[in-house]
Structure formats: C-alpha cells, structure tokens
C-alpha cells in the first residue's frame, strides 16, 4: 500500500545506539509470574461501551492547536502531559531500563531508582523484551510486585521485536507480537502493559498483519495502547491509514532518539504527524549516551560509561573527530547552563521537553544522585525562553529547517 505524506523520511545511514549496544539478540530467559497485587482488575478490552445514552451532550471548548495539556502534580512538582492526543496522562519524565536494570546495576539499586522516581511523581516506566535478554523486565516486575503500588497509578511500556534466536521469536509477525507480549507479561508479573511498542519496523511483515495483531492484543486486554519505536514518518502514516481502512486501532505514540545532535525527526517530522493523526512522541537518550555531560574532553576518563563492557562504540565516538566537535559544542553550552543555574545535563533534558508534541523524555540513570539531578531539569524548562533557545541553536549550528 502506497501512502503519500509531506513528512520527510529521515535517512538512517547508521545503526542507532541501541542497535550497536544490543548487538546479537539473545533469547530472553523464561519466567513465571502471576498478577500483581493491588486490587486491579482486568483492563477493558476493545469492545463497545454499552447502550447507555445521555440526555444532553455539552461540547468542550477545543484545546489550543498543537498544545499538549500540561498539569503539575501536587507535592512533587512533576509535570504531566497527554500521550499524543490520547487520554493517557504520563509524567513528562519517565524512567528507562535499557542497559541498567538486570545488567549494569544491582537489583537493590534498581529498586532505589524506581522508588525515588515514583515518589517524585514519575509514573512512566519503560522496558523491552530484549533488554538484558529479559532480565530487565523480570527485575522491574519483581520490584513492582514487592512495592505493592496501585496498578492504576503507573504506566508500564514494553517493546517487542527481538525475542529469541529462533526465526519465529523475533520480528513483528502476528505470532511474535502475541507470544512476545505474553512472555513480557510473564516476566513483568502483570496482567497487561499500558503501551506495547513495535521496537523497529519489520519489512518482512505486512503492515496489515502488524496492525491487526496490535489491535488483537489490545482487544484481549494484554495492552491498552500500542505505539512504534524508530519507525519512519511514512511507516507510521501507513499504519494509521491501515487502521482507518479496516476499522482497527492506530498507534498513539512514536519512541524516537532525540538530543542536541539528533534533531530532525522530532522537530520536523513528528510534529506534523501529531497535528495530522494525533501521534505523540516519547524520546530517549537525551544525553546522547552520556556524551552530553561535559565529562569528556576528547579523552575517556576512568569509570565512565565509555569504559563499560559493550560500550566500545561510545569510546570510539568520543575519540572520533565528529565526537570531539560535539564535545566542543557541549563546552560552548556551559555558560548558558551556568547562567540558568543548572548543569548541562539538566539543560539538555529541558531542551528536549520543549519540542512540540513530546509527551515524555525517558531517563537512563545508574544512581539516585543522577536521577535527582535529571529530575531537576523540570525547573530549567520554565527558564527556556525563546531567546535562550535561539542562543542554543546558534551554538549548536544544526537547527532543522522546513523544506517548504
């Protein structure tokens, strides 16, 4: 099916940082588990709403065009936004589990991070079947079960694509979407996830099959919404058109890499999809895998992320000419950060949050100190005036421009 769209598809010339780090995809370990306590019941499926009628309908005034409704949590200061144009409210900062849960940090540290995040208003926790070969999901599930938080008080997202070594254990076939999600639920010890993401596009699976399978898992109560991750704008539009053609459920969100040096997709392509079809954005890697921290100066210090096993690509990036240029730009941003009374990491995260259509930014941290620093970016967001953003753009020299 050919779909025309004004969005410019991003040219992916190299593998993303997640691809490089994950490397060959090992199969997830098995896992037993039952429903988490807390009194929640099965989520509603995709059926009708019943026959009750209302005597009068009072239309609500429309929201400002392109505006994400934002509110602030009582006692925490956390800000909440709608996930795209859906009704789901998510914290504008979420906690990711990539390369940390089940691998880089201990289970005790993982529990501390989840607790600190939850107590500071974070309600969005993201994982994937491939993270640490399933151990990240298992660790997250064990913590949630031990904490006993109300299931209705947080949002769990997982991603499906790379499951195991067998041909039928990866990709976006109907078989793997259903069985992969069931495996994730077993490891998470949950009855459902709030959002299931297709963790990349799959040219070997027909789009209709993908959309029908996602609709099926939602109708079966295994997920409440579905989204995409690292899909092109054209692919997302095709999925939406397929859903509308066959009365299926369209995606509500795209997960995309976004930081000072990765801008075009989130700034130029996804806002158009947000306005046209209501697809929101959840972004990841706001610090470019720690490159935007001012800790590197063409060198790789001891005990930094670039020295961790599996991060050889980051070490090479830091020492490359392109990496050195990016580090120079980070150094140039330090005066702006000092003027705002924040760290360059806080500035970078707040900068990501200001993009149109972005519902949440996922944080990847390995200590409570890092998490608290990153949560402080919310105070910086209000200080990002148009003038400040223009100064940042001038220093970066890579602002995306419309081709209209």
From Swiss-Prot:
Main localization category: cytoplasm
Compositionally biased tracts (Gly residues): 28-50
Enzyme Commission designation: 1.1.1.-
Gene Ontology CC: cytoplasm; voltage-gated potassium channel complex
Cysteine disulfide partners in this protein: none
Annotated GO biological process: regulation of potassium ion transmembrane transport
GO molecular function, one term: aldo-keto reductase (NADPH) activity
Start and end residues of each stretch annotated as Disordered: 1-78
Positions contributing to NADP(+) binding: 97-98, 104, 126, 199, 229-230, 255, 284-289, 295, 305, 364, 366, 370, 373
Principal EC category: oxidoreductase
Biased composition (Polar residues): 1-14
Family in the record: Belongs to the shaker potassium channel beta subunit family.
Known role: Regulatory subunit of the voltage-gated potassium (Kv) channels composed of pore-forming and potassium-conducting alpha subunits and of regulatory beta subunits. The beta-3/KCNAB3 subunit may mediate closure of potassium channels. Inactivates Kv1.4/KCNA4 alpha subunit-containing Kv channel current but not Kv1.1/KCNA1 or Kv1.5/KCNA5 channels. May display nicotinamide adenine dinucleotide phosphate (NADPH)-dependent aldoketoreductase activity. The binding of oxidized and reduced NADP(H) cofactors may be required for the regulation of potassium channel activity.
Protein name: Voltage-gated potassium channel subunit beta-3
Species: Rattus norvegicus
Gene transcribed to yield this protein: Kcnab3
């Amino acid at each position: 099916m050919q779909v025309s769209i004004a969005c410019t598809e991003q040219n992916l010339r190299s593998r993303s940082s997640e691809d490089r780090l994950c490397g060959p995809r090992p199969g997830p370990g098995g896992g037993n588990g039952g429903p988490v306590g807390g009194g929640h019941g099965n989520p509603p499926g995709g059926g009708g709403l019943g026959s009750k009628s209302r005597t009068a309908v009072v239309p609500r005034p429309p929201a400002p065009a392109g505006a994400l409704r934002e509110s602030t949590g009582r006692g925490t200061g956390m800000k909440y936004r709608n996930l795209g144009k859906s009704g789901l409210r998510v914290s504008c900062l979420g906690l990711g589990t990539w390369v940390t849960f089940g691998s880089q940090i201990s289970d005790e540290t993982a529990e501390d991070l989840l607790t600190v995040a939850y107590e500071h208003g974070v309600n969005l926790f993201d994982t994937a079947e491939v993270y640490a070969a399933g151990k990240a999901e298992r660790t997250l599930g064990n913590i949630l079960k031990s904490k006993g938080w109300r299931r209705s008080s947080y949002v769990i997202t997982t991603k499906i694509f790379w499951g195991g070594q067998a041909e039928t254990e990866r990709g976006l076939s109907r078989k793997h979407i259903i069985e992969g999600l069931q495996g994730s639920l077993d490891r998470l010890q949950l009855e459902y996830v709030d959002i299931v993401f297709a963790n990349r596009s799959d040219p070997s699976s027909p789009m209709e099959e993908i959309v029908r399978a996602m609709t099926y898992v939602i109708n079966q109560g295994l997920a409440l919404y579905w989204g995409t991750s690292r899909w092109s704008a054209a692919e997302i539009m095709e999925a939406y058109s397929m859903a509308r053609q066959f009365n299926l459920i369209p995606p509500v969100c795209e997960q995309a890499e976004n930081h000072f040096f990765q801008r075009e997709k989130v700034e130029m392509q996804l806002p158009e999809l947000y306005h046209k079809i209501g697809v929101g954005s959840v972004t990841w890697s706001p610090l470019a895998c720690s490159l935007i921290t001012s800790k590197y100066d063409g060198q790789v210090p001891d005990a930094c992320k670039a020295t961790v096993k599996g991060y050889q690509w980051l070490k090479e990036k830091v020492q490359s000419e392109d990496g050195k240029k990016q580090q120079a730009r980070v150094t140039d941003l330090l005066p702006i950060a000092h003027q705002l009374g924040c760290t360059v990491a806080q500035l970078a995260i707040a900068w990501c949050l200001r993009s149109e259509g972005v519902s949440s930014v996922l944080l990847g941290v390995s200590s409570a100190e890092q998490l608290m620093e990153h949560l402080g970016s919310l105070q910086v967001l209000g200080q990002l005036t148009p003038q400040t953003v223009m100064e940042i753009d001038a220093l970066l020299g890579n602002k995306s421009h419309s081709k209209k």
